[in-house]
């Protein structure tokens, strides 16, 4: 196991919450390295927490421990869990769907229900609203520092018993592909879909082709345009839209140096559908 501990939350950095998690981790061991995935997730957005783990975990060394705290049910009877993925990474999080994308795309080998009474920061028994510090950062640091074995965090539970959000698969037919807009490339407003590049290749769509892009919200068409399938943003003029391959080798839709989401009022989630087909030659 490595000595990396990577933190994710919806806490932001405007108060001391994240710093307190760092402090607890380094009190457990000053031999670990604590890093941030993000703390800018919108409050209570479990879907985004799940996706950001999927986006990031596999690029860290095996044995890295992740702590994800987007926890609207903190203090309730929801479970606290730790998982070992098939890629060899550990994730500690509330059992509220935060592992949905990891379970679906990467696979989870083992899950432990953390004993919140025994496995928590000493003298924190009266605190019921900051498990991110008292349970997750504390146990994540112990795991990263090799001060506790994964199996000793609590009781093993069935992988299929954990909470999971609905994840839809992209589909294709002989001349088109359809998928969901999973998430935004948040700072730039680009759309990230669940459509793999392989689907476009199977239709013999290559860079330089024009595509008919149609977007639906709750089955109502809200956008349609003919857009170039570009290798990079530089392949189109500033202000022009493009279809491109994102860093997960899925299909994205963007505007060069502008926000596609803001310009066209496009959101994300399973009720946002995108349809791509090759535009007819003129």
What are these regions (language model features)?
Residues 263, 268-282:
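Pepsin/retropepsin-fold aspartyl endopeptidases
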Residues 11-15, 73-76, 258-260:
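Short acidic, Gly/Ser-rich segments with clustered Asp/Glu that frequently serve as metal-coordination loops
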Residues 123-207:
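Anionic-ligand-binding alpha/beta catalytic cores of soluble enzymes and soluble regulatory domains
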Residues 191-265:
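A conserved acidic, glycine/proline-rich C-terminal tail/linker
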Residues 10, 139, 256:
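A residue-level signal for conserved active-site and pocket-lining positions in enzyme catalytic cores
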Residues 28-34, 48, 60-69, 75-135:
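Active-site histidine-anchored catalytic micro-motif
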Residues 66, 211-213, 242, 270-275:
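Generic structural signal for buried aliphatic residues
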Residues 2-70, 142:
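Alpha/propeptide regions of enzymes that mature by internal proteolysis
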């Amino acid at each position: 196991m490595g000595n990396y501990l990577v933190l994710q939350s919806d806490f932001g950095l405007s108060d001391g919450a994240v710093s307190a998690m760092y402090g607890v981790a380094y009190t457990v061991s000053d031999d670990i390295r604590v890093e941030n995935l993000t703390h800018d997730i919108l409050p209570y957005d479990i879907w985004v927490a799940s996706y950001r783990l999927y986006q990031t975990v596999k690029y860290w060394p095996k044995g890295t421990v992740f702590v994800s705290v987007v926890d609207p049910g903190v203090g309730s009877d929801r479970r606290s869990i730790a998982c070992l993925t098939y890629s060899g990474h550990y994730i500690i999080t509330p059992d509220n769907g935060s592992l949905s994308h990891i379970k679906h795309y990467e696979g989870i080998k083992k899950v432990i229900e953390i004993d919140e009474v025994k496995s928590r920061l000493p003298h924190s028994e009266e605190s019921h609203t900051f498990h991110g510090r008292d349970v997750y950062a504390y146990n994540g640091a112990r795991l990263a520092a090799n001060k506790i074995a994964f199996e000793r965090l609590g009781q093993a539970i069935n992988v299929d018993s954990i909470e999971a959000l609905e994840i839809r698969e992209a589909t294709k037919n002989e001349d088109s592909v359809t998928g969901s807009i999973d998430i935004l490339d948040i700072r730039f407003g680009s759309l990230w879909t669940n459509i793999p590049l392989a689907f476009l290749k199977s239709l013999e769509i290559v860079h330089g082709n024009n595509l008919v892009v149609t977007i639906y919200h709750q089955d109502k068409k809200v956008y349609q345009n003919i857009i170039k399938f570009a290798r990079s943003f530089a392949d189109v003029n500033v202000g022009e839209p493009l279809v491109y391959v994102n860093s997960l080798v899925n299909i994205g839709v963007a505007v060069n140096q502008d926000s596609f989401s803001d310009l066209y009022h496009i959101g994300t989630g399973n009720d946002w559908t995108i349809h791509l087909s090759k535009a007819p030659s003129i």
